């Protein structure tokens, strides 16, 4: 760079002592020298010190210019980049892409350089090549056929045939749902004024649907309109979906009325009276041995409902343990429905006439389940013995709760241990004579505590 140019421009010296001019690129000689030193293997920091050029300038020339584009010429300052997508380059890119549709953009770029169509300064980048292929070589198919540029540049062996199976969209005036591109048209929502029109044209829509189904095999198939079904046709189609998949979950009113007709109240009352007559009281005393199963009367017909009126049982003894009950059926009902006091009358369950076999009726199955609940013990649980606060059972009563072969009712004959001797704890005499065994008599006295030790000082 001449010396007078430095004085004429707004120049100066950088941190390394090199001259520069504001707003002007680095001279071509310095740029070429930077590239030559880089080819020799000199590091960018050493190039910066030798040529007295800032490190940022060296990195930009090598990285952003030479290594990417292969050129060391400076870019245009104060203007846009020169256009690389010239008509000649676009035509060549189109020819390469038609000859080899799977050709990559970087391969097209290398071929442009190899054939001399572009040089290192005018060759388009990979992104520019992809943009040219996307916008100018491959045209979208929804454009008119006469104005499509791709059809003009196609080879004679490649032609585009329009599909006759695609029906053009109907005009907004003929669509009862409104404009196709409106919100109502896209969502399929009918306009307020179209309900009356659909009711008037229901016959025409049904005829149109039948004609379309008949002519679908001969002519081009038309799209099925969303308003082809009238309300008269939609009601029988929606009936199966309105039914409950689980009919027992919710009982309909008609189903309830039918069951009320099957079980009238006078018939239920007469059935309850017959059920009372079949119950015979039993005076069988309840034994103390609960391990043996008790026998209970079972109703012969499990489906005949009945109500039970139980009198107050007579207690034979004044102890807290009842020894006998007037009826064995009272035991069953007392266990199942423990909230009913003695002497109370169980009313007939006329409030639920349609669910006689499910709710509120005592049947033979209920008695059987009550007998299982009255068994000696529940599975996995020992017999209940009340605490001292609740009362106590005699030893004979506790022994009667289990089988006699398993436990003895007699008390233990030996006397309890008042003190535990070493002979009882260690029956083997060799353990007592072991050097590792220290008896309580041979143990030394405890060492004096800290307080005691300080007292002796």
Swiss-Prot record:
Residue numbers bearing the Phosphoserine modification: 304
A biological process from GO: positive regulation of DNA-templated transcription
Keyword vocabulary terms for this entry: Developmental protein, Differentiation, DNA-binding, Nucleus, Paired box, Phosphoprotein, Transcription, Transcription regulation
Gene Ontology MF annotations: DNA binding; DNA-binding transcription factor activity; DNA-binding transcription factor activity, RNA polymerase II-specific; RNA polymerase II cis-regulatory region sequence-specific DNA binding; transcription cis-regulatory region binding
Organism: Pongo abelii
Top-level lineage group: Eukaryota
Subunit structure of this chain's protein: Interacts with WWTR1.
Chain intervals with Polar residues compositional bias: 160-183
Function of the protein: Thought to encode a transcription factor. It may have a role in kidney cell differentiation. May play a regulatory role in mammalian development.
Coiled-coil segments on the chain, per record: none
Protein name: Paired box protein Pax-8
CDD domains in alphabetical order: PAX
Region (RED subdomain) location: 88-136
Record gene name: PAX8
DNA bind region: 9-136
